[in-house]
């Protein structure tokens, strides 16, 4: 009888110890999962939006200094951010997911399937805004000429011809992503919103290279 009771006691003790061990492992996993991740340390696939949904967001709807709005496009994060001066501070106003060139790196020539990069010291500018609702393009994929630019085409003044910010008719499933021939694509709804609320001829546009670190004002306004 004593031997049976002793065996039962040992079994209960072992089971209790095992349950405590599992609970401890589960608790550690939860703590690890909740740890904040630095976007600069994320694998490129995550940082570029391949594994996360992204939608347009407006962060500030108040008044900002006239003529102070500018754009920063991140090749790494696949986002177009609108900034402006509010009470003396550079403030994040809005954000849109984008589709950029199929290939990474600095654009060197027409047709190389790369989006050009620039710096804050030498930004690109919006040189004209055109109604592109009837424009077609043949991507060479067998579909022939198709509507491909959305409602608006915002032409950029760059060292290369034909680069602009436009809609994404028929390809919005690749947003955000890397599929353009060099232009910056927004969804059709987003290009309309961006044009109506922020874009204007002469607006500065900075397109950051994949390895370009965040500017101080970007770090201060991470959302």
PLM feature spans:
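Bacterial N-terminal signal peptides that target proteins for export
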Residues: 1-9
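Alpha-helical transmembrane segments
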Residues: 12-16
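C-terminal motif of bacterial Sec signal peptides marking the signal peptidase cleavage site
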Residues: 18-21
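Bacterial signal peptide processing site
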Residues: 23-25
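Post-signal peptide N-terminal segment of mature Sec-exported envelope proteins
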Residues: 30-52
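Exported/periplasmic cell-wall-interacting domains
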Residues: 46, 59, 132-223
């Amino acid at each position: 009888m004593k031997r049976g009771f002793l065996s039962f006691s040992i079994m209960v003790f072992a089971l209790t110890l095992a349950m405590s061990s599992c609970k401890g492992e589960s608790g550690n996993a939860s703590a690890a999962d909740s740890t904040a991740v630095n976007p600069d340390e994320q694998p490129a696939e995550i940082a570029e939006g391949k594994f996360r949904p992204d939608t347009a967001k407006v962060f500030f709807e108040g008044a900002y200094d006239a003529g102070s709005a500018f754009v920063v496009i991140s090749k790494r994060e696949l986002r177009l951010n609108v900034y402006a001066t509010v009470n003396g501070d550079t403030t994040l106003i809005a954000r849109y997911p984008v589709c950029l060139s199929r290939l990474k790196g600095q654009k060197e020539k027409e047709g190389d399937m790369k989006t050009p990069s620039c710096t804050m010291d030498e930004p690109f500018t919006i040189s004209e805004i055109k109604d592109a609702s009837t424009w077609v393009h043949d991507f060479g994929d067998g579909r022939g000429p198709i509507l491909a630019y959305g409602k608006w085409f915002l032409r950029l003044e760059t060292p290369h011809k034909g680069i602009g910010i436009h809609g994404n008719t028929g390809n919005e499933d690749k947003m955000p992503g890397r599929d353009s021939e060099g232009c910056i694509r927004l969804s059709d709804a987003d290009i309309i919103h961006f044009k109506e609320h922020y874009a204007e001829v002469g607006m500065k546009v900075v397109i950051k290279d994949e390895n370009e670190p965040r500017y101080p004002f970007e770090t201060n306004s991470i959302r």
